[in-house]
Amino acid sequence: GRVEAIGKKVNKNNISSREKIIDLNGKYIFPGIVDMKVFVGEPGYEYKENFKTLSNAALSGGVTTVITMPNTDPIIDNVSIVDFLKRRGRDKSKINIYPTASLTKNTEGTNMTEFGLLQSKGIIGFTDGYKTIQNTRVMTRIMNSAKDLNSLIMQHAEDQELSKNGMINDGIISTKLGLQGIPEIAELVIIERDLTLLENINCRYHISQISSGKSVEIIKKRKEKINFSCG
C-alpha cells in the first residue's frame, strides 16, 4: 500500500467508508526493505529458486528491492547475460531487482570484467559474491578502475586460505558441535588490506557482511578517515 496521509486522529468517522482501519498499536512500520546480497538461482539453479519464488518470498518479509549476486550458471560477467536477467526480472518478479556483475571473469579472481560496458547495461555494482579477491595486485587494479568509472565494488571479506574447510566462526560453539572453525583473522586481514588500499584509491567500496567484533572496531576507526559502507 501507499501512505497518503498521516494523522493522530484517524477513525471511521473521518475516513471514507471504502477504507479499512488496521490497528498497528505496538507495531513498527518501515519503508520497503532492501536486501543487498541475494543469491537467486536463475539462471542455472532454478531448482533452488527463480525470480518468481524469490519475489514472493521477499514480499512476505517486507523486502521490496534486492541486489542479486553474480554466482549463477553461467556467471554474470557479460552483457548478454545481463540483458537476460533484466528481461526475466521484469517479466517474472513483483519487486525491484538490481543485478550485480562479477568483479573478475568467471569469478576466478584473475581477469577483470568490463566495468564500463556492464554499467552501461544497467549493472549497479560489482562483486564476486561469496568469493573474495585474494590477490592484492588484482584488487588494486579493480579499485583503480572503480575509481575512474565511479563503480561500486562489494567485497566478501574472507581470506579463503585461512578459512578453508571452515563451517562457522571458530570458538566454543564450533568446538561443541565438532565443526571446523573459521578463525577471526580470516576476515580481519582482508578488511585491513582493502581499507589500506582504499586510503590511497578513493573508490566506492562496500564490505558485504561482517561477523566479528574486532571487525566492527576496525571499521569504526577507519571510518574516521575514509568513506565506505558495510553490512
Model-derived regions, located:
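Histidine-rich, glycine-flanked metal-binding segment
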Residues: G1-P31
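Metal-associated gating/positioning segment near the N- to mid-region
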Residues: K27-G89
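Histidine/acidic residue-rich metal-binding segments in metalloenzymes
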Residues: M112-G231
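A short helix->loop->beta-strand "cap" motif at the edges of active sites that frequently abuts
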Residues: E19, V63, N150-S151
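Active-site mouth loops of central-metabolism enzymes
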Residues: M36-E49, P70-T72, Y98-N111, Y130, ...
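Alpha-helix-loop-beta-strand connector modules within alpha/beta enzyme cores
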Residues: F30, V79-T100, N144-Q155
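Divalent metal-coordination and catalytic microenvironments
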Residues: G1, G26, K37, A58, ...
